[in-house]
Each structure stands twice: as C-alpha cells, then as structure tokens.
C-alpha cells in the first residue's frame, strides 16, 4: 500500500506534518468503526480494515526513518537490515567504540553523565545522517537509492543504540 497516496501526499522525505495530521483526523472520522455500527458485517469489516490502514499509514509517515523505508520500498529497494552486511568499515569501527562506551559507562565515576555524553554524540550523528538521507531520497536513481538504504541501516543501529542508552539511564535514575 502506498501510504503517501492514501494521505494524498507527494512522496517526499520532508512531509508537511500539519497536513499529515489533519488528513489523518479526516480519514479517522471517515473510517472509524463506530460509524458503521449498524452496517452489514461485510461493511464493518471493510471499515475496520480501512481504519487499520489509516492508522498504519500515519505511524509510517509521521517518523522520518519509517517514512524513508516506505519510500525505498515503493521504489522496489529491498531493505534487508539483518541479512545485509554493512560495508562501511569506519562505521563498523564506530559501532564497536559506541558499544564499548555504553558498557564502560556503568563503571564511570558519573555513569549518568557518561551516558548523556554518549547520547548527545549519537543524537548528533542521527541528525547528520537524517539530513544526508533526505538528500538521497530527493533523487531516485539506483545509486541514490542504495546510498539511502545504507543510511537507513546505519540509522536503525543508531536508534536502537539510543534506546539502549535510555534504558540504562532509566535504570540509573531509579536508584
């Protein structure tokens, strides 16, 4: 399903979030199952399916990473996150350094500050990569699509790492 078409948006990495939210509200009203309470079972099922598509589409389009993945899927680019080995040696080394920093943070004199510092570094990298990703997605040639797919893989790792940092920060804050 093309969620851009569902929301009447031009496929683009940069979406008008206000327009997306407004269209979501309109589509929710049109497809909400309560509107079909007295309808036939078939119509109720169709409304439920349409409403699920609207919800799924909104979730995909509202976040940059899932929106990028959707754009690439629409272009026929397979995103085999787990199966595709990262070819960027420098990024692999950086991953190992970040993992080491994450592990070492709990033994630091001020673990929370160490985690916050790591989180700031990762957040800056995410911001930079999202900017690069937007540039590649504005193009549609094979090389740009492959570069965008590689950035999506990197961003997946970085978002997962940020989540792990948050978990460790929360655990420290509980004490």
From Swiss-Prot:
SUPFAM superfamilies: Chaperone J-domain (SSF46565), HSC20 (HSCB), C-terminal oligomerisation domain (SSF47144). GO terms for biological process: [2Fe-2S] cluster assembly; protein complex oligomerization; protein folding. Residues 2-76 form the J domain. NCBIfam families: hscB, PRK05014.1. PANTHER family: IRON-SULFUR CLUSTER CO-CHAPERONE PROTEIN HSCB (PTHR14021:SF15). Interacts with HscA and stimulates its ATPase activity. This is Co-chaperone protein HscB homolog. It comes from Pseudoalteromonas atlantica (strain T6c / ATCC BAA-1087).
């Amino acid at each position: 399903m093309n969620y851009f078409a569902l929301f009447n948006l031009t496929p683009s990495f940069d979406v008008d979030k206000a327009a997306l939210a407004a269209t979501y509200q309109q589509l929710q009203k049109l497809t909400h199952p309560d509107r079909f309470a007295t309808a036939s079972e078939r119509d109720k099922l169709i409304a439920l399916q349409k409403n699920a598509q609207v919800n799924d589409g909104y979730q995909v389009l509202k976040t940059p990473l899932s929106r990028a993945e959707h754009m690439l899927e629409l272009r026929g680019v397979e995103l085999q996150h787990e199966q595709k080995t990262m070819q960027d040696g420098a990024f692999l080394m950086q991953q190992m350094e970040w993992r080491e920093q994450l592990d070492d943070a709990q033994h630091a004199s001020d673990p929370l500050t160490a985690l916050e510092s790591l989180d700031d570094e990762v957040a800056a990298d995410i911001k930079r990569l999202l900017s690069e990703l937007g540039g590649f997605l504005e193009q549609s040639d094979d090389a740009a699509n492959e570069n965008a797919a590689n950035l999506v893989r990197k961003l997946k790792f970085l978002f997962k790492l940020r989540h792990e940092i948050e978990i460790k920060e929360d655990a420290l804050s509980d004490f």
